């Protein structure tokens, strides 16, 4: 090769330099790439090791949840109110259906027929081939799940899966629905005790993790497996007594029907000494096993109103919320004259009145700061009256005077003491208070601020509050405060949970009665009890006499408060109520009944005395014997009391006549024999004293029916005679004190209905037309 003048090969120098530069750049790039790769490997293997390991495991293993058994809810005597049982969840794996080329139409068709799920819905889910988990049906009962297993086995379908779950059952349906509450599809509590104590009842779920194949199926010999056992939830025993709850629901439901109640009803039965709730009812009710379904009446009303599907859904959701709402703790209302118990207690405690005090009611009175005279409910007034009579008459004017004797500042202090105001709370909350009952959804009271209420130049708020108006409280607040008035003066915190037990039955916690404070003295409480007993026991003066039960000493107070005026008809809406306690000399229980908007077309005067008091009387008549409270009859009660028909079939006529005479009953013989072969009414029936029992001698009663007469307005004695002439019998649901004076206000079988001979008709009595005016 020719060389240049300097002896070098032409072009050699620049080429070599280019080579060196290229090698250098390649080295730098190689080192840089190595460093990047090393950094990335460090990031993956060191920094993100745990993350990628978890991801790898997630691809190689499948986790199955082991559901915890939710704790059982019992009543105070061990009756099961809520329980869980094993069910299954059926789901499909669209990815596996695709992988194994399974017939998704056949799968969708078969599951639809077995589970009752829409075919198109299942088919659409089966088409989501990127998914390994699509739920077809939850809470599937074992017998149905077994059909799915057979369908899966026969078809050899890998893509159909079944996993264990639990379902909540409520053996008593709607009993104590608002107290117990319910759970959702995921077994999370959504209302009542189920929600308030969800963390206690739910326990902790476990899991099983197993190695899987690329197809997502379990490996025969798992190289990876982990198991964490579930911890079952704890169980709860309530203070609720299922028997008492049933009594209260039965009579409250009947009242809603009898008085055509438009906006539901509520009732509470409480142990006065402890605050334990024996029964809490809110109507309308619903079945806990089907809590999303509203009543047929509500559905029909919504259907008649809704103009579109969207509006229907909105109205349906509102109806659900309304039926789930617990009126006993969530609704506030003006208590009306039932609050006079509180005014009475504070006045007696302060010594500004005594049982010897007297008052005059002219029908109205002027109040400082009020533009118009304040009227009593009784037109023309009650005239002169003692303190006891003022309470019996439920006189508004007398109680305005009593409130003024107490004074606005002391009245406000006692309102706080009885739990209606909380001045220790934040400023934004100082006009309200709650009892703190262990149940979600409790509302607070609504009270005047202290500066407005305690204005000495305007006593209108004090005047209205003295007889239970211009403020709102909840039913649970009222019964708690009234219990304090009659139990010796102790304000107790109401509660529903008696104890919590683990899955082995060991008691974890026990609720002890909690004294909030003593509000009045035992002496004052005794005076309150004595006066309130006269409201029920005095059949001529007391507005609460319809709560009377023969043989039992019951005290109480009526209440009737106005809500609003209906826009179309202009009619007023009322809440009528009655709160009673028994035995009056040593109270064990208190019962509050509240009826929201009774109909004026029911035939009964709208008032607490005429509507709510009889309901409480019927509840007391069932509950007190159940609690072991023995009746103590006066001579007059024994003479007027209804009689139980003895068994005389098989006796000679002479023996039968003697047995019936001893029972306070008469008889008439039908037939020519010497031995009683049958009788009407049957043994065990309770009928009016002196009623005529039919004795059949040698023959049996011939089936016969009569048309039920209208007994309303008749005296008890006249009703007995009217029914007796038809071969029917009468008994008084709320007891008899004077068969000539007491009048029938309601009957168990409606007029015009057919009724068989020998049937016993239960009637409700009130004293007379004059006493019927004692409505508040």
Named regions from a protein language model:
Residues 511, 551, 565, 593-776:
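Ligand-recognition elements built from short beta-strands and adjacent flexible loops
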Residues 3, 82, 88, 214-227, ...:
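Beta-lactam-recognizing serine transpeptidase/beta-lactamase-like catalytic domain environment
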Residues 176-178, 276, 341-342, 479-482, ...:
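Short, solvent-exposed alpha-helical surface patches in non-cytosolic proteins
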Residues 121-131, 167, 261-274, 360-364, ...:
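Acidic/histidine-enriched alpha-helical segments
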Residues 92-94, 164, 181-184, 271, ...:
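Flexible glycine-/small-residue-rich
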